[in-house]
Amino acid sequence: MNPKTYIPDTFIEMIREIMPEHLSMDEFIASCRTPLRRSIRVNTLKISVEDFLVRVSDKDWTLTPVPWCDTGFWIEREDEKSVSLGNTAEHMAGLFYIQEASSMMPVTALLKNNDALDCVLDMASAPGSKTTQIACAMQNRGVLVANELAASRIKVLHANLQRCGVYNAALTHFDGCVFGGWAPESFDTILLDAPCSGEGAIRKDGDAMANWSLSSIEDIAAIQRNLIISAFQALKTGGMMVYSTCTLNLSENQHVCHFLKETFGDAVEFEPLGDLFEGAEKSLTEDGFLHVYPQIFDSEGFFVARIRKHAAVETPKVKKRMGKFPFTIVADADKAIIAEQLQATLSITLPAESDVWVREKEVWLFPANLRPLIGEIRFQRMGVKLAEQHKKGYRWQHEAVMTLATGKEDVAIDLAPEQAKEWFMGRDIRPENLLGKGEVVVTYRDYPIGIGKWVGNRIKNGLPRELVRDTNLFDI
């Protein structure tokens, strides 16, 4: 319990008025003062759940399945104080994502009985927990547009996508309100995890409610109404979207969804979520939404609504000023040469559902499904930077290895634990009784952690400086 957690009296009174009668107010307050259980989600782009459980079976980790996400687990660790979860080898290799359990629920709702994943939009995506969860379902097929308004969070979003092996993403940096006009009827599936007042996050941060007020709720709800309208306009007819928040008041949740229904009438259908997982009915509202109070599942507070679009709706007319697209698509013959060189050098195969583009001396891999959106939306970053072209050939990039390598390549060098720690600290490796030449895929316990190059009797470290960890790394 954390008795110092700040809970405004006005907030308590508001919850008392809206919380279902069968739920206890005392349990709600006690839950708000109880620290949140940590949770992770296995990244199935890199490893299966079964293989992950085998891999961590020698650790002092107690993993409890999250009922609404078959790749999610609550985690308890004995060594949390000596090594942070983010500095474990498995995390740095992208084998799992640290994600609050409740935040896995919107993507579960998005994906259930939904295979329309050719063109997907995550409208407010940073830092990337739900984006990478969606990417796991897509298995790098189709195109995943990940939008983020805050410029400072784009870099973190990209780093997380790269670490997790996502190569079908295209990043945009806009207010989400532009999508309805710029890209109407463009996306099969949309997640709008809307910016909110964060009432459900009180268990993570005792001061989360320090700036909370009823008036601020109304200001935020106005933004959310604009966002949900834009998302619905950008959704294809027949498509499906999920609206979610990590807050509890009605203004930012039910009322926003009702506003959408009032605006577009029968074009909007709320699909009930009572059978989303065993026990989901405990948080079900009369509209079929999930309104998750923290004491129900011992989790963060959350709201999830699943919405189907049955008819096209009016969209704003906009004048686009895109500028010249700075990339040129590579002809099939040249793409084949690049693919051959990548295979010959690193034993990596280019994905079939992708295009190769160039910008000056840079070589990039874009998802093929991105083509219809080029010229319609301005992108901040797309796909994966494969290489830089030099006189002697291609200099392959770290992100190419992290997204495309499997660890089973002929040129893979598997490091011992002490060597792996040195690698993550940005140092070169000197393998004993081993010599080679050229570039190599560097692995730890058979999973890629970067690209290196033989220089004499050492492997030169190719880890980007921003990914170097200096202290508090995993135990050997």
UniProtKB/Swiss-Prot annotation:
Protein name, per record: Ribosomal RNA small subunit methyltransferase F
Active-site residues from the entry: C246 (nucleophile)
Keywords carried by this UniProt record: Cytoplasm, Methyltransferase, RNA-binding, rRNA processing, S-adenosyl-L-methionine, Transferase
Alphabetical list of NCBIfam families matching this protein: nop2p (TIGR00446), PRK11933.1 (NF008898)
Role: Specifically methylates the cytosine at position 1407 (m5C1407) of 16S rRNA.
This protein's GO CC annotations: cytoplasm
Stored HAMAP family: 16SrRNA_methyltr_F
Main localization, broad class: cytoplasm
Residues annotated for S-adenosyl-L-methionine binding in this entry: A124, S125, A126, P127, G128, S129, K130, E148, D175, D193
Pfam families according to UniProt: Methyltr_RsmB-F, Methyltr_RsmF_N, Methyltranf_PUA, YebU_pre-PUA_dom
